[in-house]
Amino acid sequence: MTSRGDSREKILHTASRLFQLQGYHATGLNQIVKESGAPKGSLYHFFPNGKEELAIEAVTYTGKIVEHLIQQSMDESSDPVEAIQLFIKKTASQFDNTESIKGIPVGLLASETALISEPLRTVCMKVFKSWEAVFARKLMENGFAEEEANQLGTLINSMIEGGIMLSLTNKDKTPLLLIAEQIPVLVRKKG
């Protein structure tokens, strides 16, 4: 028998994946329950406020995973240019096999719901800012002033999000690789 925690985790994981692939409006609660294998009543037990509550938790869940992946790349090199390029190249590698593309972590849901759901817009904004902060911390550790590092963090994340959108649309990682190539121009070394 599936434990309550397992059912919640399955629902959350499945919802996160489907929102990334299909977006908010194309993902139905019945599909989430069916694909998660969780008991039907468990969705409303764990997410009594329905789809919006589930989407908010799914964005938070996905956001933490991506933040961890960014931090891993930042930890792999002391050079911020190399670390940022590494993360972008790892992200680009998802597009090596177009049949296994996982979708857009938060961008699709954010663009689809920002004007209709303030709670979803807010959680997406917080997730984006958490990713930007990882880049900014790396830059500050390497001599960048806080304001400049924060601006660059936002710019880098914006470029990556746009690169993911273009790579997904083109089924080709070239846009992300072009961004990685331009990071040295954008992030001029201090010292």
From Swiss-Prot:
Q: Where is the HTH tetR-type domain?
A: 5-65
Can you name one GO molecular function term for this protein? DNA binding
Q: Does the keyword Acetylation apply?
A: no
Q: InterPro entries, from UniProt? A: Homeodomain-like_sf, HTH_TetR, Tet_transcr_reg_TetR-rel_C_sf, YxaF_TetR_C
What are the record keywords, sorted?
A: DNA-binding, Repressor, Transcription, Transcription regulation
Q: Which residues bind DNA?
A: 28-47
For the keyword Repressor, the answer is yes
Q: What is this protein called?
A: Uncharacterized HTH-type transcriptional regulator YxaF
Q: Which organism is it from?
A: Bacillus subtilis (strain 168)
Task: Point out the gene that encodes the protein.
Answer: yxaF
